[in-house]
Amino acid sequence: ERLRVKSIYGILFHDPESALEAPKVNKELSVIKETGIVKKTGYSVYTPKELERLISKYGLPDIVQIPFNHLDRRFENISIELKAKGVEIHTRSTFLQGLYFMNPNDLSDHFKQVKPYLNFIREKMCDNNLIAGFLLNFVLSKPFIDKVVIGVNNVTQLKTNLNSLNKDFSNDTIEAPDVLDHLLIPSLWPKN
């Protein structure tokens, strides 16, 4: 009522552990969904293992929100499978919390494994607008992805990101290295 809408498109659990420990809440969401107040329910997860545990316990959700970007493709296979079963796939972390725009030389040794990759992207794309366009177009090119969530700091960034959708990056092939989770999950990064 306070939102001034008749229904909400989707509600996602943003803490997989809470979702696993709250079968009553999951059941209540199902009841609310049946009334039509909420159209879709699902989960925002950090690892494929979390998603597998949730599906094992509660069955297929309507929506999953996952981190996905040029470097982080851990969810690609399971997303293809879920999409084929009718699950809506939303992604976040297209720019990996801004890591792609940071100067690799200023990064701590924690990121040693990806510094050459980040340097190569910076050299090939020349500026942050092209990097953003390449990364956004990469994610949007995946047929299993329905929605992409990105963060912007101002209207100029939003316009730049939208304009980058008109650029052709099909000839820009950049291989991403296989990296460990400690580089893909920002909560595992050093605090500085």
Give residue ranges: language-model regions.
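Active-site groove signature of glycoside hydrolases
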Residues: 1-20
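Beta/alpha (TIM)-barrel catalytic core signal, keyed to glycine-rich beta->alpha loops juxtaposed to Asp/Glu
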Residues: 16-191
